[in-house]
Design a protein with these regions (language model features):
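GHKL-type ATPase core
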Residues: 1-6, 87-111, 124-161
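Bergerat-fold GHKL ATPase/HATPase_c domain
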Residues: 1-59, 70, 104, 109-118
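Short, small-residue-rich loop/turn micro-motifs
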Residues: 19, 95, 121
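Active-site phosphate-binding and catalytic loops of NTP-dependent enzymes
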Residues: 24-28, 45-47, 65-81, 124-134, ...
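Conserved ATP-binding N-box helix of the HATPase_c
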Residues: 49-80, 140-147
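Structural motif
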Residues: 83-85
Length: 161
């Protein structure tokens, strides 16, 4: 049974083995498309090189902020700042924060909801009924964390940080 050996993988092992399923392609891609030149204020058609997975990771973090805006009827997360450079992506919002306490549905759990959201697949607030969310699978931030060499998460729920 060597070639067809039955295996059970952890969530993280599966994400690493099949990244395309979670965050898209991990290889450099080349596409012809319209490009905006900020200095001239004009568009030109040219070749863009990028890694789709990097775009998806940025999108996952931005989507979390947008979900807070939707959840609060656009009273919170009204300002979403995104900073991207050659080695990092930073997303900051003025939202409500992820609770800095253990989840109520898991007695005995000592990790905060924030830590769980950033480190555990299939966790979050997107599993209730009548949810209008962009993120629905509970894998976004935790997948970004899996592929990050450094992941810093900060949350302030109004009581704790």
């Amino acid at each position: 049974m060597s070639e067809r050996e039955f295996k059970i993988l952890t969530d993280v092992e599966h994400v690493l083995l099949r990244p395309n399923m979670y965050i898209g392609g991990i290889n450099l891609t080349e596409n012809e498309q319209w490009i905006y030149d900020k200095e001239s204020g004009k568009f030109s058609y040219g070749t863009v090189k990028y890694v789709p997975a990097v775009i998806k990771c940025a999108s996952e973090l931005i989507d979390n902020s947008i979900d807070v805006a939707i959840d609060t009827n656009f009273e919170k997360a009204t300002r979403i700042q995104v900073r991207v450079d050659d080695k990092s992506i930073e997303v900051v919002d003025n939202g409500i924060g992820i609770p800095c306490e253990p989840p109520k549905n898991k007695p005995g759990e000592t990790r905060t909801c924030a830590e769980i959201a950033w480190t555990t697949l299939k966790s979050g607030t997107s599993f209730g009924e009548n949810r209008n969310k962009i993120g629905t699978n509970g894998v976004g931030s935790s997948c970004v964390n899996v592929f990050s060499s450094l992941f810093i998460g900060e949350s302030d729920d109004g009581t704790r940080r």
